[in-house]
Amino acid sequence: MPEGGLIVAVDGPSGAGKSTVCRRIASMLGAKYLDTGAMYRVATLHVLRQGINPSDTTAVVQATRELPLSVNDDPASREVILDGEDVSNEIRGRLVTQNVSAVAAILEVRENLVALQRELAATAHRCVVDGRDIGSTVLVDAPVKIFLTASAEVRAQRRYDQDVAAGRLTDLATVLADVKRRDELDSNRSVSPLAPASDATVVDTSTLTLDQVVDTLMTLIEKSAERTAR
């Protein structure tokens, strides 16, 4: 297992399994875990709670400039704090899911959150960071860059199962439509579009179990550590 400082950047679309896999890997590595997607979801929830239309760029930027967000980087914790309240379940709801791409596409919002993400990763020493532009924009010098993906149908089924387990009312067709819509928005936005970094390893998780994905990523991490040690 790699020793010393380590940054692992894991990107990919919604439902690719990033959060589950990264939590497991961070625990195995004794590292911190940073879910940057949750940060954008918190920003979106904050905007919606203020009654702001996500298309009102000026109002969104002003509302998120000093976001009352507290980040828990313990991989065993799913707690996400907005203004003193755990919103870990609410940020996964359909309303936030429908609007997060619009908020995340705003340049000033991304600049503010990217600065925070870089600061948190730098101070963590050992950190597994997941998102959509970590390897390509946020942490371009990360020694390990991985892009997790899967078919839209598989990702929708995973997200649907998560919603059902969390007691959120939905149906598979609606979730699939949301997944495809978000793929389109995230891939075509002008600021940090969703795409693998040029030096990232792409891993398709469509037919892999969680353990198989974890094993694949741990192998990539160990190989990177071996190359660095030479």
Curated annotation (Swiss-Prot):
Pfam families: Cytidylate_kin. It catalyses: CMP + ATP = CDP + ADP; dCMP + ATP = dCDP + ADP. One of its GO terms (cellular component) is cytosol. It is an enzyme of class 2 (transferase). One of its GO terms (molecular function) is dCMP kinase activity. The keyword ATP-binding applies. Its EC number is 2.7.4.25. Its main location: cytoplasm. Keywords: ATP-binding, Cytoplasm, Kinase, Nucleotide-binding, Transferase. GO terms for biological process: nucleobase-containing small molecule interconversion; pyrimidine nucleotide metabolic process. It comes from the Bacteria. ATP binds at residues 12-20. InterPro entries: Cytidylate_kin, Cytidylate_kinase_dom, P-loop_NTPase. It is found in: Cytoplasm. HAMAP family: Cytidyl_kinase_type1 (MF_00238). Belongs to the cytidylate kinase family. Type 1 subfamily. PANTHER family: CYTIDYLATE KINASE, CYTIDYLATE KINASE/PANTOATE-BETA-ALANINE LIGASE. This is Cytidylate kinase. It comes from Corynebacterium diphtheriae (strain ATCC 700971 / NCTC 13129 / Biotype gravis).
